[in-house]
Amino acid sequence: MDSIEKVSKNLIEEAYLTKASDIHIVPRERDAIIHFRVDHALLKKRDMKKEECVRLISHFKFLSAMDIGERRKPQNGSLTLKLKEGNVHLRMSTLPTINEESLVIRVMPQYNIPSIDKLSLFPKTGATLLSFLKHSHGMLIFTGPTGSGKTTTLYSLVQYAKKHFNRNIVTLEDPVETRDEDVLQVQVNEKAGVTYSAGLKAILRHDPDMIILGEIRDAETAEIAVRAAMTGHLVLTSLHTRDAKGAIYRLLEFGINMNEIEQTVIAIAAQRLVDLACPFCENGCSSVYCRQSRNTRRASVYELLYGKNLQQCIQEAKGNHANYQYQTLRQIIRKGIALGYLTTNNYDRWVYHEKD
């Protein structure tokens, strides 16, 4: 029987090679089960004895500096491992259940971020996103659910800006998912008093040209971000809204007035990470092997709101008559399916059934 150290290392290496985003170690009444999340699918990897599961979770808790003896409360931890294939950052989260603790591991490989033209399904959209970086100040907002690729897009834009514009770029994230030696990266640490709002205030005194704000979570952070955008800084950030228009109303909920939105917001991009059609599987990949053998399995689509269309949407939010016309996520995904780029399940997963 392999040692628990070897089991844990093999598990991480396999997840890395499979390009899994998460590992789920789930205890059951008599045994346990391990799942890999590959793309959007949760795929069963193996069964495990209950005793081995408890030892494995305890081992990961020890490595990530959690309290091994505490099994009644949820805990979080993280660590970075050096594998033969490269470095990987792991974010751990335990959850007490009726069948012992469950553990989910977020797997974040530390390799180069693809350029925006390789991320975007449609090259024209990627070129438009890059054009926004020419602005010296203002705010560029990305919206979408967790796992829609917002952080990857932000870092792809950061790399482009660093290479072509030579700017002083500072990021504020919770947590820092991708390490980049070319930018100053600050991690939110609420226990130490480094909240989003406090961290952003400190960054403004550090002579930044470009600020990457992981997420606008509260009214104070929104206010400081808007102030930064109005005083000569280019701010890239994210919000959780269903579509691009929703970001306007979200900022209003945070107490940002219409004039400030008009003066600062350059563009809003609603993003989704969609499954590309597999040349081998008619109804989408069902096996880990098939998913692993394809280098490019997903791409990003963006609903872009900028220029006249953005101004018209702001007018609509004011209660005025508006006339705008831009491609919605529904139309973009439908176009991708019609061209044979995307699987039909993308439509059911990401599109809300409403009028265009």
UniProtKB/Swiss-Prot annotation:
GO terms for cellular component: plasma membrane. Pfam families: T2SSE. Keywords: ATP-binding, Cell membrane, Competence, Membrane, Nucleotide-binding, Transport. Disruption phenotype: Transformation deficient. It comes from the Bacteria. GO terms for molecular function: ATP binding; ATP hydrolysis activity. It is a peripheral membrane protein. The keyword Cytoplasm does not apply. Gene3D superfamilies: 3.30.450.90, P-loop containing nucleotide triphosphate hydrolases (3.40.50.300). Its main location: membrane. Induction: Expression activated by ComK. The keyword Acetylation does not apply. ATP binds at G144, P145, T146, G147, S148, G149, K150, T151. It is found in: Cell membrane. CDD domains: PulE-GspE-like. One of its GO terms (biological process) is establishment of competence for transformation. PANTHER family: COMG OPERON PROTEIN 1, TYPE II SECRETION SYSTEM PROTEIN GSPE-RELATED. Required for uptake of DNA by competent cells. Belongs to the GSP E family. This is Competence protein ComGA. It comes from Bacillus subtilis (strain 168). The gene is comGA.
